[in-house]
Amino acid sequence: MRTRYQVREPHTAHFITSSIVEWLPVFTSARCCDLLLESFAYCREHKGLLIHAWVILDNHFHAIVAGPQLPQSVSDLKKFTARGILAQLPLEGRDWLVNQLAYFRAPHKRESAHQVWQEGFHPQAITTEAMMLQKLEYIDNNPVRRGWVASPEHWRYGSAHERLAGAVAAFRCDPWR
C-alpha cells in the first residue's frame, strides 16, 4: 500500500499538485483556467474546502487546501473540471488536445474515453508556519521561475495577484492565519 502521499488529517492544510496527463497544455486559455476556479468555488461552498493559496500553470496547478473530506473534494474538483475541459476544448478549436487526452487514457480507466488528470494529487501536510511560508513562496514564484512574469503578483491565475498586489483576484483565498 502506498503511504507517501496520504491525507491523515484532513482539517490540516495540505500542499497539493494535480497535473494534466502527459503534461499537455490545457490551461493556456482563460476559459479552461476559469473552469478550475469555478470548481474551487463549488468545493468551497458545498464541501467546506478552504483554499489558502493557488496557482494555475499551463499543465498543472498547485494549491494549499484544507477541508473535512479533502480527498473526495479534490476528486470531485478534478471530475467536474475534466468534464468542462472536454466540452470547452473543441469550442476553442483544440480538438488535437481532446485526441491526445483520449490517446493517453490509462487502460484501466474504462469509465471514460478520455483522461484529463494524472492520478492522485500528492498531498503534503503543512505542519509548521515555516513550511506554510515555503509553500506559499513556491506557489507564488512558479510563474516567475518559468519566465512568464517578472514578479509573482503579475500572474493573473495565482493567489499572489491578490495577496501581494492587493488586486482583485480571479479567485479569492481563505485566510490561513
Model-derived segments and spans:
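Short catalytic/metal-binding and nucleic-acid-binding patches
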Residues: 1-177
